[in-house]
């Protein structure tokens, strides 16, 4: 078992939006297991809103993995930054090659977690993720295998900031939505095409909900506009459209208004 108390810990994870949300139970459980630790989370810069206001994290570090930092020198520099941060424990949650390289470069007394096969020798223990588990449980399982016996958490959590709630409320007011109105949100995009449901099926569900007395709203980022337009074109009723109008933090705030 690794002693996490009073330690300076960095967690590294450079995967997609949904994957990052799925690590939030891990972060909550880590904080409960190590209430006196100083916890830093390294994430993709464009996704930082997912964890920026998380009360279980002390510091958020970012790297623009597909933008200005998409080169070996930047990854090496982040490894050096971690070294300079004088962390006691590094935990990597995914065998992503970028994270694994950064972590291999970094000099930290205890490096544990998942790793790309080329860098497994830098981790002790190197943990193979149990992909038979739900993804959120798979990340929690890393703590279990490090000796944490009580995994206290509240499921998936995103904490928007005050400005995020203000932007969301302005949108709902502009749409003429009263606080009493039932609202169901749709976030239909996916970076993986095989995970996408057919647009006409979303349209049919949205129409049914509208007939049941609910307002419907389509969320998503700018890259989801084409999918949303395809679904809306097949609807008989008219939904609200918030696609591409919110940052990640604002989206989380807006979604908190939905009953489903």
Model-derived features: positions:
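Catalytic machinery of carbohydrate-active enzymes
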Residues: 1-260
């Amino acid at each position: 078992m690794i002693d996490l108390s009073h330690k300076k810990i960095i967690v590294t994870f450079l995967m997609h939006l949904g994957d990052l949300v799925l690590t939030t139970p891990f972060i909550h459980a880590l904080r409960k297991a190590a209430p006196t630790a100083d916890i830093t989370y390294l994430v993709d810069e464009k996704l930082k809103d997912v964890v920026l206001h998380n009360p279980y994290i002390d510091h958020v570090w970012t790297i623009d993995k597909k933008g200005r930092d998409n080169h070996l020198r930047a990854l090496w520099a982040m490894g050096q930054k971690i070294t300079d941060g004088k962390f006691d424990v590094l935990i990597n949650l995914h065998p992503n090659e970028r994270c694994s390289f950064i972590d291999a470069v970094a000099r930290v007394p205890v490096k544990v977690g998942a790793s790309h096969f080329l860098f497994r020798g830098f981790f002790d223990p190197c943990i193979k993720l149990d992909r038979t588990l739900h993804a959120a449980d798979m990340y929690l399982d890393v703590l279990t295998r490090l000796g944490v016996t009580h995994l206290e958490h509240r499921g998936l959590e995103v904490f928007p900031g005050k400005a995020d709630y203000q932007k969301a409320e302005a949108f709902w007011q502009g749409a003429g939505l009263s606080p009493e109105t039932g609202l169901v949100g749709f976030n239909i995009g996916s970076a993986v095409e095989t995970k996408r449901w057919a647009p006409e099926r979303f349209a049919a569900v949205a129409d049914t909900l509208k007939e049941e007395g609910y307002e419907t709203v389509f969320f998503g980022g700018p890259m989801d506009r084409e999918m949303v337009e395809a679904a809306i074109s097949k609807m008989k009723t008219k939904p609200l459209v918030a696609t591409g109008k919110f940052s990640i933090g604002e989206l989380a705030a807006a979604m908190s208004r939905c009953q489903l």
